[in-house]
Amino acid sequence: MIDTSIPLVDLHRHLDGNVRVNTIWELGHQHGIALPADSLETLAPFVQIQGKETSLVAFLKKLDWMVGVLADLDAVKRVAYENVADAALSGLDYAELRFSPYYMAMNHKLPIEGVVEAVVDGVKAGLKDYNVKINLIGILSRSFGQAACTQELEGLLAHKQHLVAMDLAGDEMGFPGELFNEHFKRVRDADLAITAHAGEAAGSQSMWQAIQELGATRIGHGVNAIHDPKLMEYLAKHRIGIESCPTSNLHTSTVASYADHPFRTFMDAGVLINLNTDDPGVSAIDINHEYRIAKSELKLTDAELAQVQRNGVEMAFLSDSERKALYAAKV
């Protein structure tokens, strides 16, 4: 099912959406933070999906517990380290971990730039202990507004040498992409790649805006593109990658069922698309789960799954030499 001769990658993976349940428990007790449960076992339903949520916003509330225990920069560093470990232990050869320093900092008023530094330090420590390639993507959390995103952007750009790209995430309907055009002009000026959450809660126009105005070369989720034939044609022609996260889309009620997921429609249209976990800690999944689902529920053949793996390597924010090195390591 997973072709071991092809690098296995996860490109849409939120670092702050992958905090271990036991880490939430331990950090909560260490810092005297009131948790919603009185045991590790009963904590899980508050931080992980049980079935599916009614909306993206309800899903995101699970994430609040994950960042709610980040009481100091050591906690941030620990979570970053464990993200590297989890990526390696799930069999990934390469992962792009994205994170929102404003979101991670806000509960305990941590310095935004300090959060970025702690994430970088935690990832570096993890890479000394685990055999996996990791790159970082900074997130601007649109839900907190333009001013907050300016603070976030400045904290991230201060460490731009440790990033490969910037992302726009959060409440797509309430805070449309055009509010952040100036932010992403600065991202382009910094020579960072751009991806954006779009076409998840909003329609195809959100994707057009992300591509044409923000400068996105990849789109997170993008499920609503299928209702716009011109956009589908554009995506295929220009090799705009779709970072697909089927289980997350089910959990957020973006799609009603796996059978309703448009993954097959994208593939049949020749759109570059790959499989990702999104918030693996919240969804309680790993990349292997997504490939199993793609075969059993999305009805992809082994040959198609191998193409999806190759797509992921092509879509990755890597140089050609780095891509070749990933393949060479599989021989």
Swiss-Prot record:
<dbReference type="GO" id="GO:0005829">
    <property type="term" value="C:cytosol"/>
</dbReference>
<feature type="binding site">
    <location>
        <position position="12"/>
    </location>
    <ligand>
        <name>Zn(2+)</name>
    </ligand>
</feature>
<dbReference type="InterPro" id="IPR032466">
    <property type="entry name" value="Metal_Hydrolase"/>
</dbReference>
<feature type="binding site">
    <location>
        <position position="14"/>
    </location>
    <ligand>
        <name>substrate</name>
    </ligand>
</feature>
<keyword id="KW-0378">Hydrolase</keyword>
<dbReference type="InterPro" id="IPR028893">
    <property type="entry name" value="A_deaminase"/>
</dbReference>
<feature type="binding site">
    <location>
        <position position="170"/>
    </location>
    <ligand>
        <name>substrate</name>
    </ligand>
</feature>
<dbReference type="GO" id="GO:0008270">
    <property type="term" value="F:zinc ion binding"/>
</dbReference>
<feature type="binding site">
    <location>
        <position position="14"/>
    </location>
    <ligand>
        <name>Zn(2+)</name>
    </ligand>
</feature>
<dbReference type="GO" id="GO:0009168">
    <property type="term" value="P:purine ribonucleoside monophosphate biosynthetic process"/>
</dbReference>
<comment type="similarity">
    <text>Belongs to the metallo-dependent hydrolases superfamily. Adenosine and AMP deaminases family. Adenosine deaminase subfamily.</text>
</comment>
<feature type="binding site">
    <location>
        <position position="16"/>
    </location>
    <ligand>
        <name>substrate</name>
    </ligand>
</feature>
<feature type="active site" description="Proton donor">
    <location>
        <position position="200"/>
    </location>
</feature>
<dbReference type="GO" id="GO:0006154">
    <property type="term" value="P:adenosine catabolic process"/>
</dbReference>
<dbReference type="GO" id="GO:0009117">
    <property type="term" value="P:nucleotide metabolic process"/>
</dbReference>
<feature type="binding site">
    <location>
        <position position="197"/>
    </location>
    <ligand>
        <name>Zn(2+)</name>
    </ligand>
</feature>
<feature type="binding site">
    <location>
        <position position="278"/>
    </location>
    <ligand>
        <name>Zn(2+)</name>
    </ligand>
</feature>
<comment type="function">
    <text>Catalyzes the hydrolytic deamination of adenosine and 2-deoxyadenosine.</text>
</comment>
<feature type="site" description="Important for catalytic activity">
    <location>
        <position position="221"/>
    </location>
</feature>
<feature type="binding site">
    <location>
        <position position="279"/>
    </location>
    <ligand>
        <name>substrate</name>
    </ligand>
</feature>
<dbReference type="GO" id="GO:0004000">
    <property type="term" value="F:adenosine deaminase activity"/>
</dbReference>
<keyword id="KW-0546">Nucleotide metabolism</keyword>
<keyword id="KW-0479">Metal-binding</keyword>
<dbReference type="GO" id="GO:0043103">
    <property type="term" value="P:hypoxanthine salvage"/>
</dbReference>
<dbReference type="Pfam" id="PF00962">
    <property type="entry name" value="A_deaminase"/>
</dbReference>
<dbReference type="GO" id="GO:0046103">
    <property type="term" value="P:inosine biosynthetic process"/>
</dbReference>
<dbReference type="InterPro" id="IPR006330">
    <property type="entry name" value="Ado/ade_deaminase"/>
</dbReference>
<dbReference type="GO" id="GO:0046936">
    <property type="term" value="F:2'-deoxyadenosine deaminase activity"/>
</dbReference>
<dbReference type="InterPro" id="IPR001365">
    <property type="entry name" value="A_deaminase_dom"/>
</dbReference>
<keyword id="KW-0862">Zinc</keyword>
<protein>
    <recommendedName>
        <fullName>Adenosine deaminase</fullName>
        <ecNumber>3.5.4.4</ecNumber>
    </recommendedName>
</protein>
